[in-house]
Amino acid sequence: MKSIIFMGTPEFSAPILQSLIDEPNYDVIGVVTQPDRKVGRKHVLTPSPVKKVAVKNDIKVYQPEKLSGSAELTELIALNADLIVTAAFGQFLPMSLINSVKIGAVNVHASLLPKYRGGAPVHYAIMNGDKETGVTIIYMVKKMDAGEMLATAKIPITDQDDVGTMFEKLSLLGRDLLLDTLPQLIEGNVQPVKQDEEQVSFSPNISPEEEEIDINLPARLVDAKVRGLRPFPVAYFMMEGKRTKIWKTKVIDQTTDLKPGQVVSKTKHELLVATGEHGVISIEELQPAGKQKMTITDYLNGVGENLHPGKQIIDNDKSK
């Protein structure tokens, strides 16, 4: 039986941890996750999904605000584990910890490396309109997501997928790929492959500025941006001067000569807006500032009489 330290935080990581716990050949001797965070309007202190799995299975949990230089780091090194497995942990691992394990430290990364190194690979794959993504298992090294690749698996991105659905799919894909790869790694039957540095791209954590949708983009990429930021952090337009979160859009198979951001047509249940490259989108769910998420029908009930074809309702000036 091989001993494992598992490190992860969000929902993506939880099924991967559970699979290692369920495997009789592995002994998860410690779980490292981010500290409990205040969540929601009531700021309820909430454990991470990974912590919930660990506690349920009576596994010791470590939650350093910063692992490097912490007392927890010293204790983890002293565990003398066979393996470290990380999956969306959210912190850099000190080399002293990586070098302390007997077999190796591996990371389950939610992209087809070397594409999309960094903290938001799923968001960027969808926002950029990619047709596929996947999971790569790599050795942990000092440089972020730059280790040699041990295994990869691909999965399509559909026009209906968002970050939530892709995280679910990629979590299970990563779980299965890890369970296939670890026995080969333990037996020494894996041939690591270096990443092609010329093909590297990055997916940094989403900044507040990145959340605004550029209506000058083609309709396909406007919709991809909405899905690529749903269910978090949620994209927005500046609609008639107010920040309005956009939860759901649909690409319409028609063209228009109206300027991006202008109303193409409006009914009681539909609002079509012009995008870049003569495209058209339907806004289907949105959330005006200070209000709850609502359907376009409910929104139009309140403001519909003020909207007419040709009216500029979305700011299309991205130069500010």
From Swiss-Prot:
(6S)-5,6,7,8-tetrahydrofolate binds at S111, L112, L113, P114. It catalyses: L-methionyl-tRNA(fMet) + (6R)-10-formyltetrahydrofolate = N-formyl-L-methionyl-tRNA(fMet) + (6S)-5,6,7,8-tetrahydrofolate + H(+). Its EC number is 2.1.2.9. The gene is fmt. This is Methionyl-tRNA formyltransferase. GO terms for molecular function: methionyl-tRNA formyltransferase activity. It comes from Pediococcus pentosaceus (strain ATCC 25745 / CCUG 21536 / LMG 10740 / 183-1w). The keyword Protein biosynthesis applies. GO terms for cellular component: cytosol. It comes from the Bacteria. Signal peptide: none annotated. Attaches a formyl group to the free amino group of methionyl-tRNA(fMet). The formyl group appears to play a dual role in the initiator identity of N-formylmethionyl-tRNA by promoting its recognition by IF2 and preventing the misappropriation of this tRNA by the elongation apparatus. Keywords: Protein biosynthesis, Transferase.
